[in-house]
């Protein structure tokens, strides 16, 4: 079963076992506008919670995407390098950024469920 959680920095995590798939929320992409470039983390990179992991650039701004948990990057979404605009059309689906092996599941405790995230962005 997949559990989806959200950060206050507008990232989502789809959690399956000890692996989280990470991307930015639809709210975040709507604030950014048309996405033109994405820099993804390197495979095998060790990330600490709240560390800048990726960069998303739009016609409006460049923003960091932060690691929502401590862990190792297992996979990146190479389709985003070729087609960064996927973030605008499917931010919470095909446009995931990276998968991370969760080092400490207790770090998930500070994240929001969908209802809390909707209240956060209202």
From Swiss-Prot:
Its cofactor is (R)-lipoate. Keywords: Lipoyl. Pfam families: GCV_H. SUPFAM superfamilies: Single hybrid motif. CDD domains: GCS_H. Binds 1 lipoyl cofactor covalently. One of its GO terms (biological process) is glycine decarboxylation via glycine cleavage system. Residues 19-101 form the Lipoyl-binding domain. GO terms for cellular component: cytosol; glycine cleavage complex. The modification N6-lipoyllysine is found at residue 60. Coiled coil: none annotated. The glycine cleavage system catalyzes the degradation of glycine. The H protein shuttles the methylamine group of glycine from the P protein to the T protein. The glycine cleavage system is composed of four proteins: P, T, L and H. Belongs to the GcvH family. This is Glycine cleavage system H protein. It comes from Bradyrhizobium diazoefficiens (strain JCM 10833 / BCRC 13528 / IAM 13628 / NBRC 14792 / USDA 110). The lineage of its organism: Bacteria, Pseudomonadati, Pseudomonadota, Alphaproteobacteria, Hyphomicrobiales.
């Amino acid at each position: 079963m997949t559990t989806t959680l959200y950060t206050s920095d507008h990232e989502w995590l789809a959690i399956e076992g000890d692996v989280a798939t990470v991307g930015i929320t639809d709210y975040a992409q709507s604030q950014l506008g048309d996405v033109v470039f994405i820099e993804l983390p390197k495979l095998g990179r060790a990330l600490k919670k709240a560390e800048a992991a990726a960069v998303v650039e739009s016609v409006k701004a460049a923003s960091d995407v932060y690691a929502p948990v401590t862990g190792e990057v297992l996979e990146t979404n190479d389709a985003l390098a070729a087609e960064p605009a996927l973030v605008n059309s499917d931010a919470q689906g095909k446009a995931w950024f990276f998968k991370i092996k969760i080092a400490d599941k207790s770090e998930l405790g500070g994240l929001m469920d969908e209802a809390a995230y909707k209240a956060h962005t209202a």
